[in-house]
Amino acid sequence: MAKPAQGAKYRGSIHDFPGFDPNQDAEALYTAMKGFGSDKEAILDIITSRSNRQRQEVCQSYKSLYGKDLIADLKYELTGKFERLIVGLMRPPAYCDAKEIKDAISGIGTDEKCLIEILASRTNEQMHQLVAAYKDAYERDLEADIIGDTSGHFQKMLVVLLQGTREEDDVVSEDLVQQDVQDLYEAGELKWGTDEAQFIYILGNRSKQHLRLVFDEYLKTTGKPIEASIRGELSGDFEKLMLAVVKCIRSTPEYFAERLFKAMKGLGTRDNTLIRIMVSRSELDMLDIREIFRTKYEKSLYSMIKNDTSGEYKKTLLKLSGGDDDAAGQFFPEAAQVAYQMWELSAVARVELKGTVRPANDFNPDADAKALRKAMKGLGTDEDTIIDIITHRSNVQRQQIRQTFKSHFGRDLMTDLKSEISGDLARLILGLMMPPAHYDAKQLKKAMEGAGTDEKALIEILATRTNAEIRAINEAYKEDYHKSLEDALSSDTSGHFRRILISLATGHREEGGENLDQAREDAQVAAEILEIADTPSGDKTSLETRFMTILCTRSYPHLRRVFQEFIKMTNYDVEHTIKKEMSGDVRDAFVAIVQSVKNKPLFFADKLYKSMKGAGTDEKTLTRIMVSRSEIDLLNIRREFIEKYDKSLHQAIEGDTSGDFLKALLALCGGED
């Protein structure tokens, strides 16, 4: 069994079996494979109940007793994923890694994701054992094989990692931290082109403790996390490798929790990844992975495996997971710390928001107006020209085109567009032609008119707009519909939900920084209303009003501090707790506010993903977000999308829409990631 560091607690899910007898196990396995068919239940029960060290003793005993190779017999008796999983457990960890890498670089094509996962996450000692195991098993040099199968900066970084020479000293020099921050900044953000060698040297050699401080200092100095700079400066497999290295430096268990989630979400399961991680981490940090998994995804690793796999394969994986966890929302101390750090990162980051649509250079409203008129005149419509012009002009420029169109032709451009294009494309193009506040006002009006109310649209708009945007929406609503937005919300919604929306619609959110004493008081109110405080005080109605006031009027920096204090006070995360304790539209509104405070681009990335997930597309939500965020933060949304869902927004749109609507959406998306 893998030994934890001195003084550290063992965090694996597989332990040495008490009263272990290798001869008895060898006999039981032989019996399980004898005759017609095999007793798979007995095989998985023995192998998942023994540590890797004990399994090696069973292999020896099996050979001594029967003159046969246990792994060869298991391969013969078992099939498919179950066989790969059991055989993986029977190999010593370094030989298991060696086999994975050999498979990744054999044959046509290379499994870069496998190479990245193994080489970015292993310790120096594990790396040395891997190199030796590869040499022993295949009589080949691992470094030479990797060089022969990869290229460029990706290859260089893999070779650096393969050396297993990362510094391991916990004593950190503040001067060297500052120097590395400066060197990374100058190698990327400040340089025309990127000095990849600096990234490779620093990220490939410095100690984990040192690099964590470098990342913290980099964020304070530049206002952006190191990951954002890597995405902006590097590309391809090299970018993916460097991001994996950074994730493993920050938290190796969190890296594997993400990999496991991505292996099981969506259609189909990436079984090779699932097997590799469950085998390799079972005696290292599976308990930490489980906690972080539950924290991030609000479901236990156990339940996701249970729903995503079947048969003996499922039973074996569940045994390796070590058990199920409590209901989502409650934390172990380690997981609470991870959530706290997420809020800390959110609080410190000065993220530069970037849209994908920018003002066109050499803008000529006269030429654009004429081109649009020509595209709509006569028989048929030239949709390509309409899409090309309107998606490549800023909203201010589009308003100038509208004015010029009217001056030249005495016609209303919006009316002409309505008569020439239809369906989803019309909604998108006409939305782009409206000033943002008038577009939002129209979306709110549509959400409230007719039978039923689109509460999700009301929440999405009112929970995410700035004070200035909200004030502009109020003016536009009054101008366009001769009624105040507040009156419209009052007549179309009710109860606590109505009060939340009206509070948000006033646009009176504070805009200052945090107040620590006030934040602790606010966190206490949140704990009491969510019924997890030790000492409730005050009546429920009064608490509900105070909680609403906190979420709807406190500044974003202050709320981030409130949510951190909430974790310290309760060992719970506020978002998970709201989801668990509340229901209906009130819950959805509060969750949207919390998510927007934490990471607004990620909030919109989630909404976009859900609009295209499963059968059918929610074109209204897709259009609304693509139009309203195109000049604000759509580039940031794109980055969050690919980070969370392992595919680009461009790919998702391409797979879910078609025709001219697809063309216009891709133009707004602004490129592939």
From Swiss-Prot:
Residue list for modification N6-acetyllysine: K63, K68, K75, K81, K306, K370, K418, K483, K620
Modified residues (Phosphotyrosine): Y30, Y201
Gene Ontology biological-process entries: apoptotic signaling pathway; calcium ion transport; mitochondrial calcium ion homeostasis; monoatomic ion transmembrane transport; negative regulation of sequestering of calcium ion; regulation of muscle contraction
Induction (UniProt): By Epstein-Barr virus (EBV).
Record-listed N-acetylalanine modification sites: A2
Modified residues (Phosphoserine): S13, S422, S537
Listed name of the protein: Annexin A6
Protein source organism: Homo sapiens (Human)
